[in-house]
Design a protein with these regions (language model features):
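C-terminal domain/tail detector
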Residues: 354-583
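Mixed-charge (acidic/basic) macromolecular-recognition segments
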Residues: 1-28, 34, 222-274, 282, ...
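Short linear motifs embedded in intrinsically disordered, proline/glycine-rich low-complexity segments
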Residues: 1, 55-64, 74, 78-83, ...
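Short, Φ-rich (hydrophobic/aromatic) sequence segments
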Residues: 45-53, 75, 201, 306-308, ...
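Short, low-complexity Pro/Thr/Gly
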Residues: 171-368, 372
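Short amphipathic beta-strand/extended segments with alternating polar/hydrophobic composition
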Residues: 107-109, 122-128, 217-225, 420-425
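Extended assembly-interface regions of large multimeric machines
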Residues: 1-214
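Extracellular ectodomain segments of secreted/surface proteins
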Residues: 57-61, 81-82, 144-179, 298-303, ...
Length: 583
C-alpha cells in the first residue's frame, strides 16, 4: 500500500471505528450479537470485512481528490472560460501618418498586424474599430485664468484650460467638410505617466468647447461628453464569452490592462467641428483647477490620436489528429514543428476530415434542440501542465473498430515571444493606409493561467459572487473585496482593492425619471468609502458599471463614493434603472 493511500486508509478506518462506537451506544443489543464492545470488534472475520470497506472507501476518496482539480477546471471552462486561460500580450499601436494632409481610413475590429520578434513572426488582432483622423494634433498647451481669449458662456467658474490644436494640413480642407463623428484620444501623460492627467480629466473638467484657432467662435459641449473608455462594454480587450458574467470581464481587464484607462472618447465632436468653417480648430477643456506644476509639462506628447489596442491572439487551424477505438482522448497540436512558440488558448471548433469534406462536431455543452441528432460531440480539457486533449463522443455504432481523422480551429498566442517585437508593425489586411504603425510601449507580458491547487474554493466563490450574497453578508466590505480579488490573479497587483475601506448597501424606494416620466421604483443605493490619497475616479467608474450588471429589470442602482477622512460625497453617479440597461 502506497503512502498516500495509507493516509486515506487510516482516515477511513478511524471513521469506521468511530461509527461502530456510535452504533454500539444507540443499538446495544445488536452490537452484542455482533461481538462489538466499546467500538472494538472481537470477530476477526467482521474485522477483516470492515478493513476492506475502509480500504475501498480510501481508494475512492483518493481518486476523487486527484481528479477534483480537473473536474473543477472543466466546470470553470464552461461557466467562466477566461478564468483559466492565459491572458495574452497587448500592444498599443499608433499610426504616424505620412504627408501634410492625413486621410481618414477605417481599420475594422479584428484586423491583423504582424511584427518580427527575434526572427519569429508574432501576430496581433485589434480589439476595436479605428477610424483614422483626417487631421493632425499639432499642439497641446495649458494656461490659467485670466485667459487671453473670450471664454464661452458656462465656463465662468473655470480657472484653467487645456487646449488641443488640430489642423487638416490643407487650407482648402475645412472641418465643416469632414464627417468624423467621435474623437478618440489616447492619454500618454507626462513622461509616460498618465495617472495624474487621467484623474484631472475625469474630476476637474468643467466644460468643453470647439473653437476656431483664435477662440472667437465657440461651440460648447457638456463636460460629460468626454468619457474614459475604461467602463465601455463595447471596448473589451479579450474575446467575449456568451455564458460569462460581463461584470467579471470588466473588472478583470481593469486589473490586467493598466493602459486601458488611458483611452478617452469625445462624443459629438464631429457635429461641433462641422460648425467651424476653418482648416484649424481648437479643443478647449475648461478645468476647475490644474496644479501649477503641471502647466509647463503639457506638450504634443501628452495626447495622441490614432491609437488602437491589439491583443496577441489569432486563429489557426490545428494539426490533423487520428482517432480510433484504442484512444480515450487525443492531443491537440497547433503546429507540428518542435521549435514553434505558438501556445493554444482555446479550442474553438472541431471537425471530422472525410473524403466528402469537413463535417463539424457539436460542443458537448452547447447541445440544443436545434442540433443535428446524428452528429458527434467533442469536449476539450487541459491538464495541469497546460496540454490540451480532445474527447470525442461518437453516435451509437455497431462497428468495433474505426479510424477517424479530426481537425481543429484554435485560438492561439505567441506567448512571451510577443514581448520582443521591435520596429514597425505591418497591417495584414487589404487596406491602404498612408503612414507607419508602431507600438507606443513594449507589449505587455502575458499573464499565465492559474495554477492554484485550491481552485475549487475559487470556483465556489465565483458561484457565490452575486449581489444577493453581498447584500446579506455579515461583513459586506470583506465580501466585496473577495469578489473583486476573484477577478484578478496572484501575479497581478490589484492595489485598488485594498483601498476599499467600507461598503454599505441600502434598499429603498425613490423617484427616478425613465423615458421622460417620473416614477417611483425600488432600488439599491451603494455607498463606497475608499482610503486613498491617489486617483480613484477610473476605479469608481468601473465599479459603477460593475454594480449595474447586477441590476434587475424593475430596480435601480446608484453608487456614491466617499474618501476616508474627507467630508461629503466625492462622486455620486446618477441612478440607473434596469429597464434602461435593457434598451
Amino acid at each position: 500500500m502506497t503512502d498516500p493511500l495509507m493516509r486515506y486508509f487510516e482516515q477511513e478506518l478511524t471513521f469506521v471505528r468511530r461509527a461502530l462506537g456510535q452504533f454500539g451506544q444507540q443499538h446495544p443489543e445488536h452490537a452484542e450479537r455482533l461481538n462489538i464492545h466499546q467500538g472494538q470488534i472481537e470477530d476477526p472475520s467482521l474485522a477483516r470485512l470492515l478493513d476492506g470497506v475502509a480500504l475501498l472507501n480510501a481508494t475512492i476518496e483518493k481518486q476523487l481528490s486527484e481528479q477534483l482539480p480537473e473536474v473543477v477546471e472543466g466546470l470553470l471552462n464552461v461557466i467562466y472560460p477566461s478564468y483559466t486561460q492565459t491572458i495574452p500580450s497587448v500592444a498599443y499601436i499608433h499610426l504616424s501618418p505620412q504627408g501634410d494632409s492625413p486621410e481618414s481610413t477605417i481599420i475594422p475590429k479584428g484586423s491583423h498586424f504582424t511584427s518580427d520578434a527575434k526572427g519569429r513572426m508574432c501576430q496581433f488582432t485589434t480589439v476595436d474599430t479605428l477610424e483614422t483622423a483626417p487631421f493632425r494634433l499639432v499642439d497641446t498647451t495649458a494656461s490659467s485664468a485670466p485667459f487671453k481669449f473670450n471664454r464661452p458662456a458656462g465656463t465662468e467658474q473655470s480657472t484653467a484650460v487645456i487646449q488641443l490644436s488640430l489642423s487638416t494640413g490643407d487650407p482648402s480642407i475645412r472641418f465643416s467638410q469632414l464627417n468624423h463623428q467621435d474623437l478618440d484620444l489616447f492619454v500618454q501623460g507626462f513622461e509616460n505617466n498618465a495617472d495624474s492627467i487621467i484623474e484631472l480629466l475625469l474630476g476637474q473638467t468643467k466644460a468643453i468647447s470647439i473653437s476656431d484657432i483664435s477662440c472667437e467662435k465657440h461651440i460648447v459641449l457638456l463636460a460629460d461628453k468626454l468619457k474614459s473608455r475604461i467602463s465601455d462594454l463595447k471596448f473589451l480587450f479579450l474575446p467575449q464569452k456568451g455564458n460569462q458574467f460581463s461584470g467579471f470581464q470588466l473588472i478583470s481587464e481593469f486589473f490586467f490592462f493598466k493602459e486601458k484607462r488611458q483611452f478617452f472618447r469625445l462624443k459629438d465632436f464631429g457635429q461641433a467641428a462641422k460648425k467651424i468653417d476653418s482648416s484649424e480648430i481648437k479643443i478647449n477643456l475648461f478645468m476647475n483647477a490644474i496644479p501649477a506644476e503641471f502647466m509647463r509639462l503639457f506638450d504634443n506628447h501628452v495626447f495622441k490620436l490614432d491609437v488602437i489596442p491589439a491583443v496577441n491572439l489569432f486563429e489557426q487551424t490545428g494539426e490533423p489528429t487520428s482517432y480510433d477505438q484504442r484512444c480515450l482522448t487525443i492531443p491537440v497540436n497547433a503546429d507540428a514543428h518542435s521549435d514553434s512558440d505558438i501556445e493554444i488558448v482555446e479550442v474553438k471548433s472541431v471537425f471530422e476530415i472525410t473524403p466528402q469534406g469537413e463535417k463539424p462536431l457539436t460542443p458537448l455543452f452547447r447541445d440544443s434542440y436545434q442540433s443535428d441528432p446524428t452528429t458527434d460531440y467533442w469536449q476539450s480539457a487541459r491538464n495541469l501542465s497546460g496540454q490540451f486533449r480532445l474527447a470525442i463522443s461518437l453516435k451509437p455504432t455497431h462497428e468495433l473498430e474505426f479510424s477517424k481523422l479530426y481537425g481543429t480551429n484554435l485560438l492561439c498566442t505567441n506567448g512571451k515571444q510577443s514581448c520582443g517585437i521591435d520596429g514597425e508593425m505591418e497591417c495584414s489586411e487589404n487596406i491602404d493606409v498612408l503612414g507607419t504603425f508602431t507600438a507606443i510601449y513594449p507589449p505587455t507580458a502575458p499573464i499565465e493561467r492559474e495554477q492554484n491547487l485550491n481552485l475549487h474554493w475559487q470556483f465556489v466563490g465565483l458561484l457565490n459572487g452575486n449581489f444577493s450574497s453581498l447584500l446579506h453578508a455579515e461583513n459586506p466590505t470583506e465580501k466585496f473585496k473577495q469578489m473583486l480579488l476573484l477577478c484578478s490573479r496572484e501575479q497581478v497587483a490589484a492595489e485598488e482593492v485594498q483601498t476599499i475601506h467600507h461598503v454599505s448597501v441600502k434598499s429603498q424606494v425613490s423617484a427616478i425619471r425613465i423615458m421622460g416620466k417620473n416614477v417611483f421604483s425600488p432600488g439599491s443605493e451603494i455607498e463606497l468609502t475608499l482610503d486613498t490619497q491617489n486617483g480613484f475616479l477610473a476605479f469608481s467608474d468601473v465599479l459603477n458599471r460593475f454594480f449595474q450588471q447586477f441590476c434587475s429589470f424593475d430596480r435601480y442602482i446608484q453608487l456614491s463614493v466617499k474618501i476616508y477622512g474627507r467630508d461629503g460625497i466625492a462622486k455620486r453617479y446618477p441612478k440607473i434603472h434596469g429597464s434602461q440597461l435593457a434598451m
